[in-house]
Structures are given as structure tokens and as C-alpha cells.
Regions:
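Pair of pore-lining "gating" transmembrane helices in MFS-fold secondary transporters
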Residues: 8-30
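Hydrophobic core of transmembrane alpha-helices in multi-pass small-molecule transporters
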Residues: 23, 90, 102-119
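Core transmembrane helices of Major Facilitator Superfamily
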Residues: 27, 112-124, 147-150
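Residue-level signature of mid-helix packing/kink "hotspots" within the transmembrane helices
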Residues: 29, 57-65, 152
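Membrane-interface helix termini in secondary transporters
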Residues: 37, 68-69, 160
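Intracellular juxtamembrane helix-capping segments at the cytosolic ends
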Residues: 38, 118-132, 139-140
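Conserved MFS/SLC helix-loop-helix module at the cytosolic interface between two early adjacent transmembrane helices
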Residues: 62-102
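Helix-loop-helix hairpin linking two adjacent transmembrane segments in secondary transporters
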Residues: 143-190
Length: 198
């Protein structure tokens, strides 16, 4: 059975792919657990760390609109792939940023990561809703639950990894985990072609 036919026969694969992506990309919801290690690693004052968070949130808001436009013009797979690239760029940028350059965190991490997570969200949400045309509330609930659980998951991840490998190690692990999940999810979304199904 081809992957396209598998998706057609098992529409739950769309929800699974979307939920897995959301679970790993809830950076705005989990910033609280990142803030203290980031302040220590990059020698940032609390105000500077708060600025990084504010820029992350602003980039997420702008990215939801831009991601929606991109999806309308190029399709959900394109939006998801761009989102993956931006998210990975932000995580790698934060991991590689010299400690003395902590002032650059909003530009190196917050903007690309905020845009990336936002590009992924509308692609996942709209495709899930269209595939579950008769059960939009259910589809939205699954994706929303994964987004909510993302904060708890990332909190556990950072609290486990940061004491051992530092916040840079946590950024690398998160990026390494998110890359295959987001790429596989984007491929699944692309194969689905957002057809109305259930």
C-alpha cells in the first residue's frame, strides 16, 4: 500500500502527525522553563530575557498570519516545510550563539523560532479540519490538546537535560527531535492534499 493510499485509508494519520509536531513546537507556552537557564548561559539580565520572550510571542503572532497566506498560495506542505526550516534555524542559532552575544538572542532565536512554530500551526490545523470535515471540533481538540501538552513536555525536557548538558544541549536535543518529526509530518500533510475526508 502506497503512503498516499495509507493516508486515505487511515485519516487518523493526519491527526497523529499534527499532534506530534505540536507537542514539540510549543516554545511560546514553555518559555518560563527556558528563561533562567538562558539568562545564566548568555549572561542576560531579566529584562533582556523578557525581551527575547516578547519578540518570540510577537513573531509567533505575525507568523500565524504569514503562514496562513503562504499556505493559501503554496499549500500546507510548503508552509510546514518553511516552518520546520525556521524553527530548526532558531534552535541551532541559540545553541551556537556565543555567550558574549546574548543580546542577539531575540534576532537569532526568537524571530525564526517564533515564525517557524507559527507557520506550522495553521498548516496542521486547517488540514486536520478539512480531513475531518464532519468532525471539526474533534480534530481541533486533538491538535489543541497536543499544543497544551507541549508546554508540559518541553518543561520536563528542559528540566531533565539542562542540568546535565546545559541549555545549549537542550536546544540541540529539541532540534534533533523536532527535525524528523516535523519533516515526516509535513510529508504526511502534503500527501493528504487537504482533501475532505471524514
Amino acid at each position: 500500500m502506497s503512503s498516499s493510499r495509507f493516508t486515505a485509508a487511515h485519516p487518523w494519520a493526519i491527526l497523529t502527525a499534527g499532534a506530534c509536531i505540536q507537542l514539540l513546537t510549543g516554545l511560546p507556552a514553555a518559555w518560563g522553563v527556558f528563561q533562567q537557564p538562558v539568562m545564566e548561559e548568555y549572561a542576560l539580565a531579566e529584562e533582556a530575557a523578557a525581551l527575547a520572550f516578547s519578540v518570540l510571542i510577537a513573531a509567533y503572532g505575525v507568523g500565524c498570519v504569514l503562514g496562513g497566506f503562504l499556505q493559501d498560495r503554496r499549500g500546507p506542505r510548503c508552509a510546514a516545510l518553511w516552518g520546520t526550516a525556521l524553527l530548526e534555524g532558531g534552535l541551532a542559532g541559540a545553541a551556537l550563539l556565543p555567550s558574549a552575544w546574548g543580546w542577539a538572542m531575540p534576532w537569532v532565536f526568537s524571530i525564526p523560532a517564533g515564525l517557524g512554530t507559527a507557520f506550522l500551526y495553521p498548516a496542521i490545523q486547517s488540514c486536520a479540519q478539512k480531513w475531518y470535515q464532519g468532525r471539526k471540533g474533534f480534530a481541533t481538540g486533538i491538535i489543541g490538546a497536543a499544543a497544551g501538552l507541549s508546554g508540559a513536555f518541553l518543561t520536563l525536557l528542559v528540566r531533565t537535560l539542562a542540568p546535565r548538558w546545559g541549555i545549549r544541549g537542550a536546544f540541540w536535543v529539541l532540534g534533533g527531535a523536532a527535525l524528523p518529526v516535523c519533516l515526516a509530518g509535513a510529508a504526511q500533510i502534503g500527501r493528504a492534499s487537504c482533501r475532505e475526508r471524514v
